[in-house]
């Protein structure tokens, strides 16, 4: 990796969080000059993408990271998810998905975001054709049929950089998406997530929980050292008030909502509030530009699918670019329309499937019409007794549904 200025590159990635840096790691194996622009100082790993929150890596995402050679460095920071328990507070019926039933070592893994960021950026330090501009920001973007020209501000200086392709990986409020003229539709769930780590009397021991309540879902994830990560979704009107309660009062509220499947909640970590919205870009590509991760589609966190969907964006984009390179025998034009059209068409079904799944869960378990609670309970019991239904959901949860890119199948890019 170099910090030296470049005036031209093949690929410009805007956004150096987990998604942008994962793409840079994938492209580092290709004969491409890649520049990444990140607003924060990456050496400090202080950007919001790499805070103390936890990411749930699906089984398929673990395979992508393993195919990129990152898993040996990351594995020591992860905890396996071997079962997922799904239930609704105050209703009978529950469903369980297990790694044993799916015939995999784990349904997924949890990892703290800071550890993920550290591993990704350590890999990029050794990438010879990779340049990081950080802290820096893109202040303007112009496109023509030959290239993208980005105006970059860094350390009080401004310069232009030309690229054959620009990749927006700068999150749900993507400035690049706006600058490129992409429209986006936003749905406000009128909910906020209280996110924190805690300890419980009984360690989670590889068990994850999705508990639906009248106020919103509670997700518990197993962490290293016997800790538990919690994502508690609450109505916006009460979330800040509950999050600000003293520890004892907050613990009592959480205990009432979740129950005692892990015994009593004991130590509580710092709480962080996040507003929950669904933001979908009307298009994910255009001339010499492509959107990935939250810049393309921001999801509700109910099923923990956001980063996993983004990693499949990364794996698919890397694959279509390497195929384009090999088809012409060089890096003549990685921003041509054909590979970007192929990328967008490939990713459309996965995005639609995951978006419908997560949005549908919120609507289903948020409905309070008479008889709906009973119907959901019966549905959970029936689901738990139907191997075919469980296998289908397991594939979706593990990121194994639909057509998969080579990295997700354990194959090299080329």
Residue locations for each model-derived region?
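FAD/FMN-dependent oxidoreductases across multiple families
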Residues: 240-335
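Conserved FAD-binding catalytic core of PHBH/FMO-like flavoproteins
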Residues: 65, 147, 151, 155-160, ...
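N-terminal Rossmann-like FAD-binding beta1-loop-alpha1 element of flavoenzymes
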Residues: 10-36
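Glycine-rich FAD pyrophosphate-binding loop
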Residues: 28-50
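Conserved N-terminal helical subregion
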Residues: 5-8, 77-179, 187-192, 247, ...
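Glycine-rich, N-terminal phosphate-binding loop of Rossmann-like dinucleotide-binding domains
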Residues: 16, 170-171, 299
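C-terminal helical "tail/cap" subdomain of flavin- and related membrane-associated enzymes
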Residues: 319-414
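N-terminal FAD cofactor-binding segment of flavoenzymes
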Residues: 49-89
């Amino acid at each position: 990796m170099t910090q030296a200025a470049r005036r031209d590159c093949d690929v410009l990635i805007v956004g150096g969080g987990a998604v942008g840096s994962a793409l840079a790691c994938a492209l580092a194996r290709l004969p491409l000059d890649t520049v990444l622009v990140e607003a924060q100082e990456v050496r400090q790993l202080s950007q919001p993408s790499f805070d103390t929150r936890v990411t749930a890596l699906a089984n398929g995402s673990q395979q992508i990271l393993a195919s990129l050679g990152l898993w040996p460095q990351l594995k020591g920071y992860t905890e396996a998810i071997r079962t997922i328990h799904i239930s609704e507070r105050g209703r009978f019926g529950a469903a369980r998905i297990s790694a044993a039933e799916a015939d995999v070592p784990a349904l997924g893994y949890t990892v703290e975001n800071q550890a993920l960021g550290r591993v990704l950026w350590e890999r990029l330090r050794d990438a010879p054709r990779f340049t990081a501009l950080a802290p820096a920001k893109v202040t303007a973007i112009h496109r023509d049929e030959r290239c993208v020209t980005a105006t970059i501000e860094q350390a009080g200086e401004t310069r232009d950089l030309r690229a054959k392709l620009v990749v927006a990986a700068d999150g749900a409020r993507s400035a690049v998406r706006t600058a490129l003229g992409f429209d986006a539709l936003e749905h406000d769930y009128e909910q906020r997530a209280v996110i924190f780590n805690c300890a419980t009397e009984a360690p989670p021991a590889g068990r994850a929980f999705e508990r639906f309540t009248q106020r919103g879902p509670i997700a518990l994830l197993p962490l290293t050292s016997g800790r538990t990560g919690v994502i508690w979704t609450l109505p916006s009107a009460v979330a800040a008030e509950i999050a600000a309660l003293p520890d004892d009062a907050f613990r009592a509220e959480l205990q009432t909502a979740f129950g005692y499947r892990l015994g009593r909640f004991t130590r509580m970590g710092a709480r962080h509030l996040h507003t929950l919205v669904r933001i979908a870009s009307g298009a994910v590509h255009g001339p010499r530009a492509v959107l990935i991760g939250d810049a393309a589609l921001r999801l509700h966190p109910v099923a923990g699918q956001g980063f996993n969907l983004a990693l499949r964006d990364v794996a698919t984009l890397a694959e279509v670019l390497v195929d384009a390179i090999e088809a012409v025998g060089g890096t003549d034009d990685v921003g041509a329309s054909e590979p970007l059209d192929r990328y967008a068409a490939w990713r459309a079904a996965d995005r639609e499937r995951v978006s419908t799944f997560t949005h549908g869960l919120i609507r289903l378990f948020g409905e309070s019409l008479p008889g709906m609670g009973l119907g959901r309970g019966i549905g959970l019991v029936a689901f738990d007794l139907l191997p075919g239904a469980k296998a289908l959901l397991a594939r979706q949860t593990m990121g194994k549904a639909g057509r998969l890119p080579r990295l997700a199948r354990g194959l090299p890019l080329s």
